[in-house]
Amino acid sequence: MNKNIKTTALSAAITMALGLSLNATAGGKGVSEVLDAVKNKANDVVESVVNSSLNDFASQFGEGNTEISIRKVKGDEADYSIITTQPLTSLGEDRARLFWQGSLGSYDQSGDRRTTLNLGLGNRWLIDDEKAIVGINSFYDYEFSSKHKRTSIGGEYKRSNVELNVNRYWAISDKHSVDGTDEEALDGYDAIFKGQLPYLPWANLVAKKYKWDRTNQDDVDGSYYGIEAYLTPETKLEVGKQDDNYMIRETYAKLTHSFGANSDHASLTDSAIATVAYQDGENMKNKMLNKVERSNKVVVEFGGITMSRTD
């Protein structure tokens, strides 16, 4: 906690203590009012300190967007990640912007905790009078302890009420032994769709289709679907079901907190029900540095038998 935060908290505490001592003799009613005021002041101080700390942390990454998330599938250990998307150029006259994206994740790989680095470059263009974004990107993925490597290319289309991302992945590391077990990163693809629910600008339907190529057994063919709800402009919760031909359908949940210049999404803190069905036609300029939607976890086959689950 920096010096300014400490000073603010100490000042607030002293002010509240003086308020109590001056008003305690005013009788039961006065004490009750003071206690309510103290509670409200304490809430304001805590909120201010937390927001200040998060903003200080986010400012270390630049003007783009940064988010932290935790994802849990029933029966598996949780996955954790931090992702930042930052500009390499300003918005040009051709309405294009070059950016980079980096992420670091801690993932459960069949009971083994592993860290993965993802680095990517992308270019996006504003089209349709700045009401839509189209983009292309390329990524490199590296799982540290196993040395699995993978590349990908992707394309995206975004509007204020709908978006579609399609990604193709290629393993560039060979099958090799990790702690006595033969492992192999897999090729594959995914397609991710998000669409606003009618009259609920703070909620999206999320659907993902994925397929991973296996050599000696049936390919992994699966999907997940759920609801993504913005609890605040910065915090969203996604809950749904994931299923493929190698797993039983299970419930998953993902909690994400974003911070940066563009954390301004409609949320439950606004009106719960909108007067129009879809929030279409909004300017997308401030969404040019939103993260690329993709699978950051390297999908691995273990001993030619078991599989890790996609994120």
Model-based region annotation:
Residues 64-72, 95-108, 132-143, 153, ...:
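Transmembrane beta-strand segments that form the barrel wall of outer-membrane beta-barrel proteins
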Residues 56, 78-93, 115-129, 151-168, ...:
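Feature captures outer-membrane beta-barrel proteins of Gram-negative bacteria and organelles
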Residues 2-6, 50, 212, 224:
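Intrinsic low-complexity, intrinsically disordered segments enriched in polar/basic residues
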